[in-house]
């Protein structure tokens, strides 16, 4: 069975959580692993009308059969980790989760610096989660590791070994990335970026998967891209236009209102190429065309929505495999059999 990586193609908040949740329940992976930066990115999913938001644990937590892992490349905030164990106790995550013993730790001093540093918080618009300062300490070889935190001891494991053993045995492994291509330290709108690379190749490395063991990369795009914080946004629309279109969103972690723009085909093509996308997922199609809300059959999509999907495929050069038409898990069109 393959390994599958899901990453964001814009500036984060693309709806990766809803795509991951669907894959977790529909494909039933044996392992769901989280790569990416750390607790500065939140993923939200709706289950039976209830919203769940996670910043540390894998978003596929609702798949009760899966082992949940946090890769060595991810920063761990013990406070957030234990809060989410409690918050998600109905899903029995405590008995299924493992943290790589090499994860670097976010300490209170990192969060304080992130919140008070005029450049980071003022100009760049960081989330205040401490990820940037913690990654800086990691690069300087000063950061603590998960193995140094006594409270984390019951959850420590070698994530890379677990995942590669599972792949050897034919298991399906789903890997989640965080944030989006435009926030990559290497390829994003520097300096208005996150503190590491978040493309698919780096996310694979975060959890210990070599490039030859990656089978599929799904890059997620939202019909109207959004951005939280400062930085270039070439297709940004005026706030008044966003209000008129009903495109009012707030960040999962920061609570700040998101800036909204029109779909950027040029950025999407570049993002898909650098990430090595084998397929695309398009979310919030119902925001682009309200008549598409709740549709689960591609043939029943209204003409406007279909033409948008076809234009994306043509201009980006990658087939669309999944389409979200609403907030609930079942509001999805799965076209992967046609690819």
Swiss-Prot record:
| GO BP term, pick one | 'de novo' AMP biosynthetic process
The protein's location, in the record's own words, is:
Cytoplasm
Report residues binding GTP: 12-18, 42-44, 258, 284-286, 324-326
Mind naming one GO cellular-component term on file for this protein? cytoplasm
- Enumerate the SUPFAM superfamilies for this protein: P-loop containing nucleoside triphosphate hydrolases
Q: For this protein, what reaction is catalysed? A: IMP + L-aspartate + GTP = N(6)-(1,2-dicarboxyethyl)-AMP + GDP + phosphate + 2 H(+)
Binding site residues for Mg(2+): 13, 42
Q: Which residues cross the membrane?
A: none
UniProt cofactor note: Binds 1 Mg(2+) ion per subunit.
Positions with a binding annotation for IMP: 13-16, 40-43, 127, 141, 179, 194, 256
Q: Does the keyword Disulfide bond apply?
A: no
Q: Which residues bind substrate?
A: 252-258
Q: Function of this protein?
A: Plays an important role in the de novo pathway of purine nucleotide biosynthesis. Catalyzes the first committed step in the biosynthesis of AMP from IMP.
Record protein name field: Adenylosuccinate synthetase
Source organism of this protein record = Pyrococcus abyssi (strain GE5 / Orsay)
Give the gene that encodes this protein: purA
């Amino acid at each position: 069975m393959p390994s599958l990586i899901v990453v964001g193609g814009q500036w984060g908040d693309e709806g990766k959580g809803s795509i991951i949740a669907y894959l977790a329940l529909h494909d039933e992976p044996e392992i769901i692993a989280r790569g990416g930066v750390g607790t500065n990115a939140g993923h939200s999913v709706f289950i039976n009308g209830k919203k769940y938001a996670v910043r540390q644990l894998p978003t596929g937590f609702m798949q009760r059969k899966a082992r949940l892992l946090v890769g060595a490349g991810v920063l761990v905030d013990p406070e957030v980790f234990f809060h989410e164990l409690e918050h998600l106790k109905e899903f029995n995550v405590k008995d299924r989760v493992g943290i790589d013993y090499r994860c670097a730790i976010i300490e209170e001093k990192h969060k304080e610096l992130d919140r008070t540093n005029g450049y980071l918080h003022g100009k760049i618009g960081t989330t205040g989660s401490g990820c940037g300062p913690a990654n800086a300490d990691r690069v300087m070889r000063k950061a603590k590791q998960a193995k140094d935190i006594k409270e984390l001891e019951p959850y420590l494991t070698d994530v890379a070994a677990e995942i590669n053993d599972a792949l050897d045995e034919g298991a399906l492994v789903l890997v989640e990335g965080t944030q989006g291509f435009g926030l990559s330290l290497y390829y994003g709108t520097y300096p208005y970026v996150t503190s590491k690379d978040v493309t698919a190749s780096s996310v694979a490395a975060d959890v210990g998967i070599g490039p030859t063991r990656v089978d599929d990369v799904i890059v997620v795009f939202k019909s109207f891209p959004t951005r939280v914080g400062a930085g270039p946004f070439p297709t940004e629309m005026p706030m008044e236009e966003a209000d008129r279109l009903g495109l009012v969103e707030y960040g999962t972690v920061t609570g700040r209102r998101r800036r909204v723009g029109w779909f950027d085909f040029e950025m999407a093509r570049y993002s898909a190429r650098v990430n090595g996308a084998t397929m695309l997922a398009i979310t919030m199609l119902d925001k682009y065309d309200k008549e598409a809300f709740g549709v689960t059959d591609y043939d029943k999509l209204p003409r406007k929505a279909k033409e948008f999907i076809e234009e994306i495929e043509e201009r980006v050069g990658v087939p669309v495999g999944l389409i979200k038409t609403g907030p609930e898990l079942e509001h999805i069109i799965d076209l992967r059999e046609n690819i």
